Amino acid sequence: MQARYSVSSPNSLGVVPYLGGEQSYYRAAAAAAGGGYTAMPAPMSVYSHPAHAEQYPGGMARAYGPYTPQPQPKDMVKPPYSYIALITMAIQNAPDKKITLNGIYQFIMDRFPFYRDNKQGWQNSIRHNLSLNECFVKVPRDDKKPGKGSYWTLDPDSYNMFENGSFLRRRRRFKKKDAVKDKEEKDRLHLKEPPPPGRQPPPAPPEQADGNAPGPQPPPVRIQDIKTENGTCPSPPQPLSPAAALGSGSAAAVPKIESPDSSSSSLSSGSSPPGSLPSARPLSLDGADSAPPPPAPSAPPPHHSQGFSVDNIMTSLRGSPQSAAAELSSGLLASAAASSRAGIAPPLALGAYSPGQSSLYSSPCSQTSSAGSSGGGGGGAGAAGGAGGAGTYHCNLQAMSLYAAGERGGHLQGAPGGAGGSAVDDPLPDYSLPPVTSSSSSSLSHGGGGGGGGGGQEAGHHPAAHQGRLTSWYLNQAGGDLGHLASAAAAAAAAGYPGQQQNFHSVREMFESQRIGLNNSPVNGNSSCQMAFPSSQSLYRTSGAFVYDCSKF
């Protein structure tokens, strides 16, 4: 195959290696055509023509030809070394580790062709670096050797100027003062190293610290001991006055925030420290899928005056984590009812029970949430917080929840004042976990508790009046298209103020058909929230949505 090419001129020789891939290509094509080498297409004759090779630039042909290659353009690129590195190279390559200025110039030009041009510029920089850097020491010339100019050498302390001998990385600018200080420090270290007892005292302070540590360390241990005592010896909840109930709720918030176990400020005061709360969260979320809803804790009629205490929550969390959610909501409902009956301002009640909750509201929805909190009880803020707590609900959903609250307000005129006050939303920050689990339950014990009758308080008065409506609403929306309105339905029962109704006429028309379907639903008389949804069905498609938990109330 090679014999077919004419090798008369060296230029054509330079082109032949360039065709290495195309030779095999054309050879395979000719063999496939069945014509053998005689059927070579025209391009081969073009490439083998010596006159055609002359069209290539001379430099390219010479690069492949037998001539000695000229300096490549890459040789004209400036080397990545600083002038200090270049001078150091020249000095270290000298036989006596000292070299004259002209010797430095010659070494640089021999090693790097880039510096063969523009000598005046870079040689001036070399002189500046020699005189300005303390690492280069000028040695006077002795008279024995002919020539002129002093020698330049490196300071003995500057040999470690470059990291690992690489001239590309210099540690820092060498200074004589720093070198002297380093020497002194090394001498001190050498003096301190021989006596080993000198190193023993440092371990002593940790022992002393351990001796003193029982002061700061016991509080977590004592707190846990108290929890276990409360868990093993549950004390009955003591009825308190409304003001005392609110005081205990707010007082319980302070040690939790200060306790070392509490690391998140977004937990409401009703939440236990994270040390024991995670044991309740996954159990109540995952257990709600497979296990039937647990029976509700008994809610006696004097539950309205019952105070919310840490003992209550700790015993419930220790006893049965699944029923802890319902008892948590009932305890919060009691304290919320107490605060609303005591006539305390709703923002105060909301702030006392959810200290870090205001930071969860998105800025566009702040007006709606503030209006709801000042509207009546904590219900408005509860509805707004339920919509905006996770940061994924928009203002229109808050409007829907407030509309639903205003629409449902008429059914609750006989209910105790603001029984479902801010309790609908208070447990929600504890359970509004960012990942969407497959359970279609988890917050229905709270939303449904407040919606279906204030978590046991209203259930005593209207066991089936509103509960069935909530259940039918929730079941009608099980298709998933309007599943995001479950929070609105949960907040619907909690508000006792129809004043918000006038602001949402357009939204009301949207839900008119749904409202008519609710009253005629066969599930109306059902007083429980037993819903069996498939575990794979997810109510929410957003990332930080609420998940709903079913439990009896």
Curated annotation (Swiss-Prot):
Region (Disordered), start-end ranges: 173-310, 356-387, 414-465
Effect of P79K: Decreased nuclear localization. No effect on DNA-binding activity. Decreased transcriptional activity
Gene3D superfamilies named among the record's database cross-references: Winged helix-like DNA-binding domain superfamily/Winged helix DNA-binding domain
Start-end of Polar residues biased regions: 356-368
Residue numbers spanned by region Required for transcriptional inhibition: 215-366
Outcome reported for the amino acid change (mutating G165R): In RIEG3; no change in location at the nucleus; no effect on transcription regulatory region DNA binding; decreased sequence-specific DNA binding transcription factor activity
Listed SUPFAM superfamilies: Winged helix' DNA-binding domain
Effect of W152G: In ASGD3; no change in protein abundance; changed post-translational phosphorylation; changed protein structure; decreased location at the nucleus; novel location at the cytoplasm; increased protein aggregation, aggregation do not correspond to microtubule-dependent inclusion bodies; loss of transcription regulatory region DNA binding; loss of sequence-specific DNA binding transcription factor activity
Domain of life per record: Eukaryota
Chain location of the short sequence motif Nuclear localization signal 2 (NLS 2) per the record: 168-176
Effect of S259A: No effect on protein stability. No effect on transcriptional activity
Modifications made to the protein after synthesis: Phosphorylated. Phosphorylated on Ser-272 in response to epidermal growth factor (EGF) in a ERK1/2 MAPK-dependent signaling pathway; phosphorylation contributes to its protein stability and transcriptional activity. Sumoylated preferentially with SUMO2 or SUMO3. Desumoylated by SENP2.
Keywords annotated in UniProt: Activator, Angiogenesis, Deafness, Developmental protein, Disease variant, DNA-binding, Nucleus, Peters anomaly, Phosphoprotein, Repressor, Transcription, Transcription regulation, Ubl conjugation
UniProt biased composition (Pro residues): 194-206, 291-303
Consequence the record notes for mutating I91E: Decreased nuclear localization. No effect on DNA-binding activity. Decreased transcriptional activity
Consequence of changing R127H: In RIEG3; decreased location at the nucleus; decreased transcription regulatory region DNA binding; decreased sequence-specific DNA binding transcription factor activity
UniProt cross-references to Pfam families, sorted A to Z: Forkhead
Effect of A85P: In RIEG3; uncertain significance
Biased composition (Gly residues): 373-387, 446-458
Keyword Glycoprotein: no
Signal peptide: none
Outcome (variant: L86A): Decreased nuclear localization. No effect on DNA-binding activity. Decreased transcriptional activity
Outcome reported for the amino acid change (mutating C135Y): In RIEG3; decreased protein abundance; decreased protein stability; decreased location at nucleus; loss of transcription regulatory region DNA binding; loss of sequence-specific DNA binding transcription factor activity
Function: DNA-binding transcriptional factor that plays a role in a broad range of cellular and developmental processes such as eye, bones, cardiovascular, kidney and skin development. Acts either as a transcriptional activator or repressor. Binds to the consensus binding site 5'-[G/C][A/T]AAA[T/C]AA[A/C]-3' in promoter of target genes. Upon DNA-binding, promotes DNA bending. Acts as a transcriptional coactivator. Stimulates Indian hedgehog (Ihh)-induced target gene expression mediated by the transcription factor GLI2, and hence regulates endochondral ossification.
Medical condition linked: Axenfeld-Rieger syndrome 3: An autosomal dominant disorder of morphogenesis that results in abnormal development of the anterior segment of the eye, and results in blindness from glaucoma in approximately 50% of affected individuals. Features include posterior corneal embryotoxon, prominent Schwalbe line and iris adhesion to the Schwalbe line, hypertelorism, hypodontia, sensorineural deafness, redundant periumbilical skin, and cardiovascular defects such as patent ductus arteriosus and atrial septal defect. When associated with tooth anomalies, the disorder is known as Rieger syndrome.
Name of the featured protein: Forkhead box protein C1
Originating organism: Homo sapiens
Lineage of origin: Eukaryota, Metazoa, Chordata, Craniata, Vertebrata
